[in-house]
Amino acid sequence: MKKKLLFLGPPGAGKGTQANLFCKKYGLIHLSTGDLLRDEVSSGSVLGIKAAEIMNKGELVSDELVLSIVEGRLLNINEGWLLDGFPRNVNQANSLKDLLEKINQPLEGVILIKVADDYLIKRLVERGRQDDNEQVITNRLKIYREKTSPLIDLYKKQGILEEIEGNADIDVVFSCIEKSLG
């Protein structure tokens, strides 16, 4: 089983849910940049306030900020890990690749969870997070298509991308992920 993984997909695709299940079953450390950022916002720090302003508009937090958070966490992990919500653009992917080479922890697999937009919007509105209103969701999906979608081709070319249909029940999606990472 691969131990250094990345889950990709649009907001609301179920990356966090699947990552939690996968990490629990296989003993990996779950690194969710969304959770890390929300924790920072909840702390009320200066950094958290800046992040909140950006996130509430549905925009992406700077590459430098997110990369430094991820680097700090990866340096303290000796076992396997699963990244969820990072990288979100080609620049971040290249920076992540450089970081992983530097710490001798190459990425072993990428799972793309694909879900139709209408299903995503419904899921996100029902989830009820503060930053999940329809206008913000639509903007987040637009940014995903513009910035994050190019990562699909990048990881396909590296031969480490597996595509999973995410419209199914949680257990079905999980089973498909397990089979693809065998």
UniProtKB/Swiss-Prot annotation:
It catalyses: AMP + ATP = 2 ADP. GO terms for biological process: AMP salvage. ATP binds at G12, A13, G14, K15, G16, T17, R127, A168. Pathway: Purine metabolism; AMP biosynthesis via salvage pathway; AMP from ADP: step 1/1. It comes from the Bacteria. AMP binds at T33, R38, E59, L60, V61, G85, F86, P87, R88, Q92, R129, R140. It is an enzyme of class 2 (transferase). Residues 32-61 are annotated as: NMP. Catalyzes the reversible transfer of the terminal phosphate group between ATP and AMP. Plays an important role in cellular energy homeostasis and in adenine nucleotide metabolism. Belongs to the adenylate kinase family. This is Adenylate kinase. It comes from Prochlorococcus marinus (strain NATL1A).
